């Protein structure tokens, strides 16, 4: 009976609790808007209209959710065994940089050979960026939260150096970006929109994450480590190996998001290829309680808020910061609910 109760709690009550906490966050934002003389119904209506009022808005929700799903998975996979990977932003830039090297160096290859190569380079770039803090955690006990966060700045600044120096387009009139990628290095777009092949990367990654977590020994051992690392060590589960494995897989997915951004949306590497996707993906993962299916839902929700924020600015004259406040309140309310539950347990 106890196991049945836990199953009901995990499959029914936890999603309902998450929805309730999210709704509470929207109520809190409404109260905040009322304090400043704004109608929250109008604000939410503008967000809804911006995201769903046209085919373009709906497609942009998906476009903005793609890197969020991949970066959220980069956080969630290590988090299931108790690791905090805050390095999604740097790992995304590392994957973008590796894919850029491939596009600029191997651009003469046919599309059928070049694109798979760029995908592999993006994965390897992100994995390499995650390997450094993972190795430090395994070999020296260095806190991965600090090391991944600090490494973000190193990698982002390295991208700045490359696009202002060795990779700078000589025809850019002194703008800091690389030459445009050849057509063979660009991902496909669909349905006359900016939705690109990165969507399939994200959905496949989320599906494999879900199946591996639920139906493989690898997923079972990760969950055991996350629940009780001491018991896992006594049972002979190799903790160090899983630290390296989960961090590198997570980094690879963030790197894949970077590859998709430069090979689809930007068609070149430039500063600011990410508008904080790595950090927002971290937020998405925590909002989703590190659950693969929850990641898809929350990434789409934040995509709606991001696209709808443009309409809030136009129709109500509210600053775009209003949307950031909504996201922040959702984050704090959901995390606050989890903390309260853990304290009372």
Language-model features: locations:
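N-terminal, non-cleaved signal-anchor transmembrane helix
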Residues: 1-65, 80-81, 167-190, 339-345
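Cytosolic-side transmembrane-helix boundaries in multi-pass membrane proteins
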Residues: 1-24, 30-34, 227, 234-241, ...
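Short, non-helical or kinked segments that cap or interrupt transmembrane helices
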Residues: 37-42, 79-96, 138-147, 221, ...
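Helix-loop-helix "hairpin" substructures at the membrane interface of multi-pass membrane proteins
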Residues: 192-268, 292-293, 297
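Transmembrane alpha-helical segments in multi-pass inner-membrane proteins
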Residues: 248, 254-328
């Amino acid at each position: 009976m106890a196991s049945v109760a836990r199953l009901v709690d995990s499959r029914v009550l936890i999603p309902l609790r998450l929805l309730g906490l999210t709704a509470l966050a929207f109520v809190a934002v409404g109260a905040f808007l009322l304090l400043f003389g704004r109608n929250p119904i109008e604000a939410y209506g503008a967000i809804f209209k911006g995201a769903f009022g046209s085919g373009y808005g709906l497609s942009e929700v998906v476009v903005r959710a793609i890197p969020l799903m991949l970066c959220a998975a980069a956080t969630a996979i290590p988090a299931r065994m108790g690791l905090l990977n805050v390095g999604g932003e740097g790992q995304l830039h590392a994957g973008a940089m590796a894919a850029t090297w491939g596009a600029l160096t191997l651009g003469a290859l046919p599309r059928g050979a070049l694109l798979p190569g760029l995908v592999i380079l993006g994965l390897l770039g992100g994995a390499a960026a995650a390997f450094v803090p993972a190795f430090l955690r395994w070999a020296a006990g260095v806190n991965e939260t600090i090391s991944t966060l600090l490494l973000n700045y190193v990698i982002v600044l390295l991208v700045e150096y490359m696009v202002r120096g060795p990779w700078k387009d000589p025809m850019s009139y002194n703008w800091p970006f690389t030459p445009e990628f050849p057509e063979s290095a660009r991902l496909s777009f669909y349905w006359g929109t900016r939705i690109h092949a990165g969507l399939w990367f994200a959905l496949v990654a989320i599906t494999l994450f879900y199946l591996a977590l639920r139906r493989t020994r690898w997923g079972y051992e990760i969950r055991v480590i996350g629940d009780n690392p001491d018991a896992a060590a006594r049972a002979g589960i190799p903790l160090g190996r899983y630290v390296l494995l989960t961090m590198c897989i997570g980094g690879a997915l963030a790197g894949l998001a970077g590859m998709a951004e430069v090979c689809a949306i930007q068609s070149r590497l430039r500063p600011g290829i990410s508008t904080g996707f790595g950090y927002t993906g971290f937020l998405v993962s925590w909002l989703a309680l590190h659950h693969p299916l929850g990641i898809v839902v929350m990434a789409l929700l934040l995509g709606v808020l991001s696209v709808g924020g443009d309409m809030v600015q136009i129709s109500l004259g509210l600053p775009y910061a209003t949307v950031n406040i909504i996201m922040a309140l959702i984050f704090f309310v959901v995390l606050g609910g989890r903390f309260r539950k853990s304290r009372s347990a």
